[in-house]
Curated annotation (Swiss-Prot):
Pfam families: Phospholip_A2_1. Disulfide bonds join C42-C131, C44-C60, C59-C111, C65-C138, C66-C104, C73-C97, C91-C102. Heterodimer: RV-4/RV-7 targets the presynaptic sites of the neuromuscular junction. Monomer: snake venom phospholipase A2 (PLA2) RV-7 that has low enzymatic activity and is not toxic. It inhibits the enzymatic activity of RV-4 in vitro but potentiates its lethal potency and neurotoxicity. It may facilitate the specific binding of RV-4 to its presynaptic binding sites, probably by acting as a chaperone, minimizing distraction and destruction of RV-4 en route to the site of action by reducing non-specific binding to muscle and other organs. PLA2 catalyzes the calcium-dependent hydrolysis of the 2-acyl groups in 3-sn-phosphoglycerides. This is Acidic phospholipase A2 RV-7. One of its GO terms (biological process) is negative regulation of T cell proliferation. Ca(2+) binds at Y43, G45, G47, D64. The active site is at H63, D105. Its cofactor is Ca(2+). GO terms for molecular function: calcium ion binding; calcium-dependent phospholipase A2 activity; phospholipase A2 inhibitor activity; phospholipid binding; toxin activity. It is found in: Secreted. Belongs to the phospholipase A2 family. Group II subfamily. D49 sub-subfamily.
Length: 138
């Protein structure tokens, strides 16, 4: 099921939110999202369960929690406005739902960038079957 996330990124194209999130991640980490974050640990990618495996995976856990607070739009498909200004990601929507989605993505991209030096290749393509410990609450 988590591999569906890769397909979703490819199918959504330039208008979809997952593409926008991927651009933010690339800007902050220098890593392509499909190869580095689409299936990483227990939370990066589609769905999530168990305990986050490291700081990178925790960024994805917090991002999932943030998406859980979004009402009135689908955070995985909502298209918002944002820009890169002097290395910062700036969300520009007045619509509360779209702005919230953008801020969730912005915070996660910044978190991933702050933890890029501890990125562990052992968690790339990590099997969800290893994610059996009880999850913390959002």
């Amino acid at each position: 099921m988590r591999t569906l996330w890769i397909v979703a990124v490819c199918l959504i194209g330039v208008e979809g939110n997952l593409f926008q999130f991927g651009e933010m991640i690339l800007e902050k980490t220098g890593k392509e999202v499909v190869h580095s974050y689409a299936i990483y640990g227990c939370y990066c990618g589609w769905g999530g369960q168990g305990r986050a495996q490291d700081a990178t995976d925790r960024c994805c856990f917090v991002h999932d929690c943030c998406y859980g607070t979004v009402n009135d739009c689908n955070p995985k498909t909502a298209t918002y406005s944002y820009s890169f200004e002097n290395g910062d990601i700036v969300c520009g929507d007045n619509d509360l739902c779209l702005r919230t989605v953008c801020e969730c993505d912005r915070a996660a991209a910044i978190c991933l960038g702050q933890n890029v030096n501890t990125y562990d290749k052992n968690y790339e393509y990590y099997s969800i079957s290893h994610c059996t410990e009880e999850s913390e609450q959002c």
